[in-house]
A protein has these predicted regions:
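Polar, enzyme-active/binding microenvironments
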Residues: 1-112
Length: 112
């Protein structure tokens, strides 16, 4: 579904819908600024679509490099966010990408 709802502390109200309906997407949020970034998701073999919420409507922004679903996300959604992991067809990915309000860039993560 592309439906978006906002919670005011006691009830939900439908607001501007996503441009691309999806499930299994990742997101990052900056609550004081009412901004949100949503990326990836399904149906099909995953999507790279990314949209930004400004408190009123969704806008298409730079897409992920790797289409996927069931992806993790973190960040403030105003200036930067990361998308990590997720499912691809077939299998899973460990790809990590950083969004900087202009584009997604693939990052290499080293663990020890």
């Amino acid at each position: 579904k592309a439906q978006t709802e906002e919670y005011d502390g006691s009830s939900f109200t439908e607001v501007g819908d996503l441009n691309t309906a999806r499930g299994g997407s990742g997101s990052s949020m900056n609550a004081p600024n009412a901004s949100t970034l949503i990326f990836a998701g399904s149906p099909g073999s995953g999507t790279a679509n990314t949209e930004s919420w400004n408190g009123t409507s969704w806008t298409e922004v730079a897409n992920l490099s790797t289409s996927r679903w069931d992806v993790g996300g973190a960040g403030d959604s105003v200036t930067s966010a990361i998308a990590f992991g997720g499912s691809i067809s077939p299998g899973v990915t460990t790809a990590t990408e950083e969004w900087t309000a202009a584009d997604f860039e693939i990052k290499t993560v080293t663990t020890s």
